[in-house]
Amino acid sequence: MLHISRSLTKLLGELKKLPSVGDKTALRLAFHLLKSPENLSALAKSLLEVRDGVRFCSTCFGITESDPCHLCTTPRDDASICVVEEPQDILAMERSQAFKGRYHVLHGALSPLNGVTPGQLRIAELLQRLENGSVKEVLLATNFTVEGEATALYLTRLIKPLSIKVTRLAHGIPIGSDLEYVDAATVQRAVEGRSEL
């Protein structure tokens, strides 16, 4: 049996805690880092900087180094809030340059089977933000999964009575794809959500 040092075993254990990192990937990453001590030092420094300097915005719950974050302090459309599941979803929305309003991160999606209930998400904080009356539209940009759909439906039921328009990202066929390779549910939603030209 191969003997691995205690510190390397500990590193492998920590790497395997990352998403999609199993035994082989952890071993490959660890040996890559060991071969280049300067990369290992830079990574360790970056990890410490993130630990000490990055936090969640107290307004939108996105990731920031200053509180409130840049997206909450710069001029944007205050009448609309886009609700996303995770902080990285803001990056995807911003890359598109299609949304000009504010954001709100739930930090997950409802999943009773996995024990994720409304109280574990940032839903109460969203409702507090909607109380002042300046928000006219909430765009639900949760993922198109069972959990994301359940979360969108739950939020719609909470927000509609506040006389705020609730919208959902459109479902559709990806640009550049062949119709014959698209699954039936996606085609059905694309047909149901079709628009007039």
Curated annotation (Swiss-Prot):
- UniProt keyword terms in alphabetical order: DNA damage, DNA recombination, DNA repair, Metal-binding, Zinc, Zinc-finger
ZnF (C4-type) spans are 57-72
Where is each Toprim domain found? 79-174
Q: Please report which protein family the annotation says this sequence is part of.
A: Belongs to the RecR family.
InterPro entries, from UniProt? DNA_Rcmb_RecR (IPR000093), Rcmb_RecR (IPR023627), Rcmb_RecR_Znf (IPR015967), TOPRIM_dom (IPR006171), TOPRIM_RecR (IPR034137)
Q: Pfam families under this entry?
A: RecR_C (PF21175), RecR_HhH (PF21176), RecR_ZnF (PF02132), Toprim_4 (PF13662)
Organism, by scientific name, is: Geotalea uraniireducens (strain Rf4)
Which one of the record's GO molecular function terms can you name? zinc ion binding
Per the record, the gene is recR
Record's signal peptide: none
This chain's protein is named Recombination protein RecR
Extract the PROSITE patterns matched here.
RECR, TOPRIM
| Chain's role | May play a role in DNA repair. It seems to be involved in an RecBC-independent recombinational process of DNA repair. It may act with RecF and RecO.
In its UniProt record, which GO terms are filed under biological process?
DNA recombination; DNA repair
Sorted alphabetically, which SMART domains does this protein's record hold?
TOPRIM
